[in-house]
Swiss-Prot record:
Native source species: Burkholderia ambifaria (strain ATCC BAA-244 / DSM 16087 / CCUG 44356 / LMG 19182 / AMMD)
Name this protein carries in UniProt: ATP-dependent protease ATPase subunit HslU
Predominant place of localization: cytoplasm
Annotated Gene3D superfamilies: 1.10.8.60, P-loop containing nucleotide triphosphate hydrolases
Gene Ontology BP, a term: proteolysis involved in protein catabolic process
GO molecular function terms attached to this record: ATP binding; ATP hydrolysis activity; peptidase activity; proteasome-activating activity
Segments crossing the lipid bilayer: none
Keyword Cytoplasm appears in the UniProt entry: yes
InterPro entries in the record: AAA+_ATPase (IPR003593), ATP-dep_Clp_protease_ClpX (IPR050052), ATPase_AAA_core (IPR003959), Clp_ATPase_C (IPR019489), HslU (IPR004491), P-loop_NTPase (IPR027417)
Protein's gene: hslU
Amino acid sequence: MSTMTPAEIVSELDKHIIGQAKAKKAVAVALRNRWRRQQVGEPLRQEITPKNILMIGPTGVGKTEIARRLAKLADAPFVKIEATKFTEVGYVGRDVDSIVRDLIEISVKQTREAEMRKVRTKATDQAEDRILDVLLPQPRAVGFGGNADHANDDNNATRQTFRKRLREGQLDDKEVELDLEQPSAGMDIMAPPGMEEMTEQIRSMFSNLGSGKKQRRKVKIKEALKLLTDEEAAKMLNDEEVKTKAVQNVEQNGIVFLDEIDKITSRNNEGSGGEVSRQGVQRDLLPLVEGTTVNTKYGMVKTDHILFIASGAFHLAKPSDLIPELQGRFPIRVELDSLSVEDFEAILDATDASLVKQYQALLATEDVQLEFAADGIRRLAEIAYAVNEKTENIGARRLYTVIEKLLEEVSFSAGNHAGERVTIDAKYVEHALGEVSQDEDLSRYVL
């Protein structure tokens, strides 16, 4: 669990997301409250439930990114789902319990990886021993007393020499023949609506049939070391312990991001055709958000302390169009701001993995030095903002389209410009995008 203070969390989020201070503050406090709850003694700890968050704002302003980065900071099981994918029980589509099943699968994978990291050093040593046994088979004991001891000393010295060469990568390209565990054969089964759990159990049953069998394979030592390390680490894990920790991790630290929640609201001016199913999804979500117990193949999972972050643009609907019970389960409401030209400018250049840095790194692989002048970045931001205003406002995602169109020619002919420097200034941007951005009909289709 993260022990970062709210200010530290916001500072980390600032490295990747521009603006949206209110939303960052809300999620930072929610994450810190989880740590605070763990410091409270029982039985009061069980009574403290997370305060779920409703983010309201247009597309492309950072709602999903805030939740995703938060989960990464907390090292918590995180699942993003779209509310429109779910239907009321009895209708065709996924039922809401599958959210928890997806979350527990992610948690098991995370927990297994964390446990394997703990035993990685020991597993690597054992994997090296297995490779050395193939490269240097133990000599048969011949003779008596001193001769056998002398042979063992020589063999140990040779093993140490080979182990050193193995660790330095000098033997990476040499091939060895090994008995490796055969991966269980995957089996795809089409799941009827609402039968995902039964399908998962059948798939698990069939996958276990082939497990444990050994297969003789010829592989390079570099790959063999990785495969054997994973195999040895897996042997050291206690599967029941992994499952228990994974369930506990979901119950205490799980984060569910419910996107497009505004699309399942009831609107008074519509016919009653789709209303039943929409309200049904809200009513099915209600016990999950309130706190219930869901049966999964890893055991019963309580959702009382899972943090739910819902988001929606709410262009046509209002948060008050949600059923009252569900509204009450999202006490923290945060409105995200639309992005300005200055925000676009910062997104292009100021974040840790900005678009400018990404494209510079990509073209550097072909020895093309890409430089963005300040006026070029400003003009790019202005064009992206203008196209959003004229056509559909898709927020920061517009920058991907604009910069891709801008660098289309450079990317295509990068091989012919090795060792050259390409400077993107306002004049270059205007030449590449000016005509398209001015023509509204053209920008509607191209940008």
